[in-house]
């Protein structure tokens, strides 16, 4: 295949991702984006300008050699592309699906200055899937054993990354997960139609083949304390996420039919409530469902409600579409599926019937004022604008908080006023030998930011195991 000129690369249009038809996909839980074939992936890869100073790499928390793996796809060497991805990331097939590339690597793609950026995320998905389903990538040999042992708490994106990187460095790694299935938010929070659980399982299989020991149903803070783990291991990484739901604290929030997004999605994703009674966990299958919030979790919840049989799925959001934190792709998918978006509305109370089941949400209309600390325009209530949205199920998706169980048994590991661990940029906590990263440090954020935190922490843990040095300025 001949080398293309820059002009020829620029002349190739960005390839769209094929999707299931919206009216078909709301009747199933299959992945919405169906993926590319080889020819499409090669053609898209040939758009890459192979920059000498690739800003896409600078903007990738997982530190992936993006031009390197894309070049291999363009040459038809798909397994080599996957090898480059796995050298930097334990979860490339996951990231190819859920990472917000449009605000990170693709945002700084030089092609995007005049044309559409190279579809880096879709190419990452293609190459990673190739190695999972078509031609298995040989497991690399780890470094010689160091004799050092590391406990990783939480088998979510940060913990999986730390475990995968440290095992390659020759350390003995045990990954502890509180639930019966590893994956963290990847399995309990993100629906099957956006991230198939098989993908998570296969990527976990890879780090287990490398030698990571996985222990499920192990609740750090109950089964064992952080202090007890430190007696057995040379270092401990805390990546237990932000799994405790936030609530509005308005009247009626304890009515039947009102769920936190955490409970609603966990019942559906992890417990397979949509297969009740084959699976024993039920969930309300409302016909008119309101989801409160504007992030990716809210989009996941409202789209889940449609697949559970809702006639109407509503988003109630107190700002406008412009301020919505959800990925534009997820908003557009929800719009295609018929979700009704109610902007500039704020719930003030839930209304119930004589059986204590929710029947309505009373809202106030809002207008936007000056930007607040988040940089988004602050919503201001319009006096006397109350109205009621009739519903039979409500999902509150306004954020997550730190679960205090782990911190309560971590002597000397300080938390901030919101219960998140205090750590430096490399994940070192206020107690020597204890590291933390991901949502339990930053608050609820993206999968890729948790992966980036995991990579930094893994390097810091490796350094600590080698030299034993610990800064005395953390938290000061």
Predicted regions and their residues:
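Iron-sulfur cluster-binding cysteine motifs and their immediate structural context
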Residues: 50-75, 94-127, 174, 181, ...
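Feature captures the FAD/FMN-dependent oxidoreductase FAD-binding
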Residues: 80, 144, 149-153, 201-250, ...
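N-terminal Rossmann-like FAD-binding beta1-loop-alpha1 element of flavoenzymes
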Residues: 149-174, 298-306
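Ferredoxin-type iron-sulfur electron-transfer modules in oxidoreductases and energy-metabolism complexes
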Residues: 25-44, 64-97, 114-144, 268-269
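Glycine-rich dinucleotide-binding loop and its adjacent helix/turn
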Residues: 127-144, 202-222, 245-308, 415-426, ...
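A conserved FAD-binding loop/helix module that cradles the flavin
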Residues: 440-465, 471
């Amino acid at each position: 295949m001949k080398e293309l000129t820059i002009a020829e690369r620029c002349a190739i249009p960005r390839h769209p991702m094929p999707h299931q038809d919206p009216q078909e996909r709301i009747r199933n839980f299959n992945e919405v984006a169906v993926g590319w074939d080889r020819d499409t992936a090669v053609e898209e890869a040939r758009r890459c300008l192979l920059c000498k100073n690739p800003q896409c790499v600078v903007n990738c928390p997982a530190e992936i050699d993006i031009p390197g793996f894309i070049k291999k796809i363009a040459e038809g060497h798909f397994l080599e592309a996957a090898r480059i991805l796995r050298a930097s990331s334990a979860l490339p097939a996951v990231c190819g699906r859920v990472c917000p590339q449009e605000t990170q690597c693709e945002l700084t793609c030089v092609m995007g200055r005049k044309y559409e950026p190279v579809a880096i995320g879709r190419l990452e998905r293609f190459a990673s899937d190739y190695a999972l389903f078509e031609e298995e990538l040989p497991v690399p040999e780890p470094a010689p054993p160091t004799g050092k042992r590391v406990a990783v708490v939480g088998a979510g994106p940060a913990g999986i990354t730390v475990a995968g990187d440290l095992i390659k460095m020759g350390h003995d790694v045990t990954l502890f997960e509180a639930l019966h299935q590893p994956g963290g938010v990847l399995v309990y929070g993100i629906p099957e139609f956006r991230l198939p659980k098989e993908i998570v399982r296969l990527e976990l299989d890879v780090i287990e083949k490398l030698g990571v020991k996985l222990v499920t149903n192990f609740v750090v803070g109950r089964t064992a304390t952080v202090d007890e783990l430190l007696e057995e291991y040379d270092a401990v990484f805390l990546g237990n996420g932000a799994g405790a739901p936030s609530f509005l604290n308005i009247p009626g929030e304890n009515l039947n039919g009102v769920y936190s997004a955490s409970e609603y999605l966990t019942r559906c994703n992890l417990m397979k409530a949509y297969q009740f009674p084959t699976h024993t966990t039920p969930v309300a299958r409302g016909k008119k469902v309101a989801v409160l919030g504007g992030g990716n979790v809210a989009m996941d919840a409202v789209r889940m409600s449609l697949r559970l049989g809702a006639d109407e799925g509503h988003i109630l959001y107190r700002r406008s579409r412009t301020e919505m934190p959800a990925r534009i792709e997820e908003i557009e998918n929800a719009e295609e599926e018929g979700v009704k978006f109610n902007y500039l509305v704020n719930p003030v109370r839930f209304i119930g019937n004589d059986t204590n089941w929710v029947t309505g949400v009373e809202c106030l209309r809002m207008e936007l004022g000056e930007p607040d600390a988040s940089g988004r325009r602050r919503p201001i209530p319009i006096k006397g604008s109350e109205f009621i949205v009739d519903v039979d199920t409500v999902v509150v998706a306004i954020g997550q908080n730190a679960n205090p169980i782990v911190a309560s048994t971590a002597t000397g590991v300080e938390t901030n006023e919101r219960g998140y661990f205090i750590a430096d940029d490399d994940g070192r906590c206020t107690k020597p030998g204890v590291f933390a990263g991901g949502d339990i440090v930053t608050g609820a954020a993206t999968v890729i930011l948790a992966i980036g935190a995991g990579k930094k922490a893994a390097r810091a843990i490796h350094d600590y195991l080698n030299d034993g040095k610990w800064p005395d300025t953390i938290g000061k």
